[in-house]
Amino acid sequence: MPVNYATPAADQLFPVAGVRLGVAEAEIRKKNRRDLTLVALDAGCTVAGVFTQNRFCAAPVQLCRNHLAGGHEIRALVINTGIANAGTGEPGRQTAQASCDAVAELLGIKAEQVLPFSTGVILEPLPVERLKAGLPAAKADLKADNWHAAAHAIMTTDTVAKAASRVVTVNGKKISISGVSKGAGMIKPNMATMLGFLATDASIAQGMLDKLVKEAADASFNCITVDGDTSTNDSFVMIASGQSGASFATETDAGWAEVKAAIIAVSVELAQAIVRDGEGATKFITVAVEGGKDSEECRKVGYAIGHSPLVKTAFFASDPNLGRILAAVGYAGINDLDVDGVRVWLDEVLVAEKGGRAAAYKEEDGARVMAQAEITVRVDLGRGAAKASVYTCDFSYDYVKINADYRS
């Protein structure tokens, strides 16, 4: 079960004018499950995205990049689960193109106006004829209040659907923001198997949206790790339909700061939901690193701790074997780090300082914190004012079982 997370009810996920979603059972890999999602966008939407940095990026990722770089007005997204269409070479690229062609014909748009997404098993061909056969049902299901169904339809090893919504009012205009994400394993995004889709009915200039999607990813999806693996298919897409009447052309526009903060908050909620549902996770851990020369070195330390199987298994066992955290700080790649200046806390319990165990630290205090479902590891590098946070989870027996049984 996820750590302190429940899928919002359908009526808690607000429609975004200009964006309609439909789902269908296409039997991409398994029967009797919704595994195909179609998103139709009204004319005038702006769209931006960031994608995996894995060199074996999936065929749909390659096509998405091309369609966005070409400046085409995006009118549709098509998402399948079960098969990732990654590691499939030229046939995979042809399959991704065929998906776009089929959506374009169905909706009366151009193939270049379609963004395809796939998630699931790598190295297996996508049964595109099944996808195409499922599209009419997905089209028939298109509606603005379908975020809840879409959140379920993009799941793979997820145990819960992940979604979030906010409404903000600026300059007298009500602005809706809704999004869904999926992922539970192969999670160490580097936008760089994680997918995130967010839409708002604000009007946002293309250049601002391009910048915002990167900033939001850096504050959210690029701060999470379940197992340290970067998927071939990671994608985060942001849509601005412009139908609320609220328009933002420059970053100095009145109300922009509030809208931007709300969009980033939804992104963080979607990203943290992935960690809370990490495969086999029993604990949610925030690694908050401060006192760095820059945020990049803080993030390095955060990821060193968050990736470490030894640290993560200690959290699962509620075992305050905290030397593992110090070891991770030491190998994080900060070559001129003065270890005597480093301090480490578990929540408010000071664990280490001056190069060793804190004088007042008692193991029973560490064990008490380690037994909690939510824990903050705070590290002060003592060398500057920068800070960054990484979100991770523990490693349990179930992580091994889930991944050992994944294809069965």
Swiss-Prot record:
Domain of life the protein comes from: Bacteria
Involved pathway(s): Amino-acid biosynthesis; L-arginine biosynthesis; L-ornithine and N-acetyl-L-glutamate from L-glutamate and N(2)-acetyl-L-ornithine (cyclic): step 1/1; Amino-acid biosynthesis; L-arginine biosynthesis; N(2)-acetyl-L-ornithine from L-glutamate: step 1/4
Reactions the enzyme catalyzes: N(2)-acetyl-L-ornithine + L-glutamate = N-acetyl-L-glutamate + L-ornithine; L-glutamate + acetyl-CoA = N-acetyl-L-glutamate + CoA + H(+)
Keywords: Acyltransferase, Amino-acid biosynthesis, Arginine biosynthesis, Autocatalytic cleavage, Cytoplasm, Multifunctional enzyme, Transferase
GO biological process: L-arginine biosynthetic process; ornithine biosynthetic process
GO molecular function: glutamate N-acetyltransferase activity; L-glutamate N-acetyltransferase activity
Subunit: Heterotetramer of two alpha and two beta chains.
HAMAP family: ArgJ
Homology family: Belongs to the ArgJ family.
Biological role stated in the UniProt entry: Catalyzes two activities which are involved in the cyclic version of arginine biosynthesis: the synthesis of N-acetylglutamate from glutamate and acetyl-CoA as the acetyl donor, and of ornithine by transacetylation between N(2)-acetylornithine and glutamate.
Name this polypeptide is given: Arginine biosynthesis bifunctional protein ArgJ
Source organism (scientific name): Dechloromonas aromatica (strain RCB)
Lineage of source species: Bacteria, Pseudomonadati, Pseudomonadota, Betaproteobacteria, Rhodocyclales
